[in-house]
Amino acid sequence: MSKHTYNRNIEITHHAMQRLEERVKNYKGFKSWQELVRTARYKGRSEQNMTDAEYQWYSTHITNLHSSSQVRIMNGFAYLFMGNKGHARTLVTVIQVA
């Protein structure tokens, strides 16, 4: 019986978000959440960066994540998603946690 917890979606609480921020800030090379957003990669969009409009939106909302935000842990990386009231979640950033 294999466990697939690495594939599990985890709803983010305010406390969990703080812990994730702490972990990111302790990560070598950390600059800022805005820098992480600026260099975020979209799943299915190859190595393409966010557009300027997308970056502007996320840079103003990244410090005010809400209950629809999620982290998906997979293969040693934390994928941070954001979503609004039923809208599709969008990949914001990827953080190595292993």
What are these regions (language model features)?
Residues 1-98:
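Ribonuclease/tRNase effector modules and their secretory precursors
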